[in-house]
Amino acid sequence: MMQKYQDSSLSPEERASDLLARMNLDEKFGQIQCYNAIDSFLGKSVEKQNPYGVGQVCILIATMLDDVGSAAGLITRLQKQIMESGKHHIPAIFHIETLTGVMVTAATSFPCGLGQASTWDPEQQQKMAACITRQGRAMGISHALAPVFDICRDPRFGRMGETYGEDPTLAAAMGTAYVKGLQDKHRMSACSKHFLGFMAGQGGIHTAQAVVSPRELREVYAKPFQAAITDGKLDSVMNSYAAIDGQVPAGSKAILRDLLRSEMGFNGVTVSDYSAVEQLESIYHLAESPADAGRLALEAGMDQELPTIAAYNDELKENIRSGVVQESLLDEAVLRILTMKFRLGLFENPFPAENVQAEITPADTALNRKIAQESMILLKNDGVLPLAKSVKKVAVIGWHADSVRALFGGYSALAMKENTLGVKMSMAGIQADADSPAAENAVQKTYPGSEVVMENPGVEPLARRCYPDAYSMLGALRLAAPHTEFLYAQGYPYAGNEESGHDAALQIAKDADLVICTLGGHYGWNASCTTGEGIDAMHIGLPVCQERFLEKLESLHKPVVGVHFDGHPISSDTADRVCNAILEAWAPGAQGGEAIAALLTGTANPCGKLPCTVARHEGQIPVYYNHPTNTCYSMTGGTPKNAYIDGAHTPRYCFGHGLSYTKYEYDTLRLEKDAIQADGVLKGQLHVRNAGNKAGTEIVQFYVHDVAASMVRPVKELVGFAKVNLQPGEEKTVCLSLPMSQLAFLDADMRWKVEHGKVELMVGASSEDIRGKAEFMIVGDAYPDGKNRSFVADTKIM
């Protein structure tokens, strides 16, 4: 006889409730645990570790396997063992990182998070996520640990490159699109992270305490999560490591129950960041034992502990059995987990596709190349780009120029795979084995003048073997411009003060019509990297070896193009002075080399815009465009001049900045009405025209400023944007619909309030390049439900 939970015609909630009622304590407890698939290679079988079944499986080991078929085979074997371990045959959820694509080398590898944000293209983001879902689910992966919703205003923080930048509206738009694309038709579940305020850590230090007020926590840091919960029906959330106001999210009722569930209306599954529950005892000393840490987390509303059994252990289970810990806490967690499994269709389709092969279609590659091209930002250009036909000989200099590895950042499959070559890994929650063969053979030599371990010589051959169709920037340039001679010298590394290669590089520069210098660090996951998880820095500029080379190059009076690779934006007085043009390339992924070549040669027109403000110096940090009135670089009093005694308050490059090979003209911003009820919608429009002779794409940005308010408000805030494709001479109309609920802020009583008064609407090509303004009046006050307010204004192009 079919049981209710076996009836696929019933809702996931009904099926989960029925199954939960049939499970004993041991079976239920297994659902809040995770098995790390790497243990299957270490003699620790899933049957032995999780004899009553398991809720999740960490499948990061798939990155180390040779092909998709091997990964799918491992998932099939483990899933069969798990389902056979219990009378209800409950399948496990298999999770993997998907920030830049499914984290296996046979899947599509997209640009890093900052690069994705720089496209300002939610529609494209949704397509990217759909590609990730198709490739991941075919392998048997059902839980994607992405997107990253952290708001980052500090380039010292090594994980900035994972984020959508500094603005909550842009992050909400991009991340919600990712969630919708990934969760379409319930094929995979997205896991947004890290809740909450993670990258506001003091000193730009990974996992350090975040000093954020309750108001800012909700208005800024929670906004992308809220948008994904409300508009994207987000399935799961991962906690932050960072303590906030004395509380650690993994064990905080105030954060997980009161804020996330009660205030924000989240009813999905919460999962711990790796080892975060155990750290309540081992690092934060909030518990007396791992099991006590597990109790704190379960009481706080943490549903599953990843990536392996630590605090959700047998002692905690026996404490539940004896009544020391309430079984109802376990039941509510398991109910949510089972509901997600039924929603994903795992009971009907628990295994990978049969005979699965790598399926990177031509459409996937084209999408990846388009995202890579549009992720890059032309920060500066005096006319030297695109490369003129008169340029016959180009000197290309820098480690990144002829490196395929340089195209990939942290949370890419390649960054994970290179850890097999023996350099100490930096991923949080994963302990390096000091006695492993890899550690034994680790390269310990560092770049002179730094603590960065020299790159293993096997990394580049590994990169080219894993991505045989990927071109380095140099290789792509030679293909894109076959009649131009490209001379190459490494010149300098990506860290330290080594100058021994300068002379050879300067020699080829003397003979060239133009010089391309690749600049920046090494973005990844181990001790040979300069930025990444657990790899933070005091200095935000270029390494000394690159700065000194640029100073020497300046004396040759050659046109210089700088191409910057990294997980944070370029910040260099020397580069600004010496380079005639600067292209920010971030970590552009497998198609990055060809994307750069297309932009430099002019077959593509740059259209990326900065998702972050670029500081001149680390002493300015934090510097961000939507700062409160009379703060940061908008000070209006209290100092003799609007500057430090040794430098400007203003940033190097502003949020939203990005140049093109054409020019765009904006006409007058017109409003349908200049008085809007507090629960109404403002409508406006303007015309944008391509006034140049090259087709291009402009990102039209809308900002608001509260003229007078009851609380100190930001000097301006992004409310919406439109990406407009224009042929030479073409004009299009951009229409804006802005619900007043999007302008709600927390009043003195911490209620969401749309407040009566004047508001200035601005439109521009960046946060500082404002092309038009219009003022309107909000009539009356309104108190919207914070979780159902508007998050991103709607725009249409006609």
Q: Model regions: which residues?
A:
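Short beta-strand elements
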Residues: 769-785
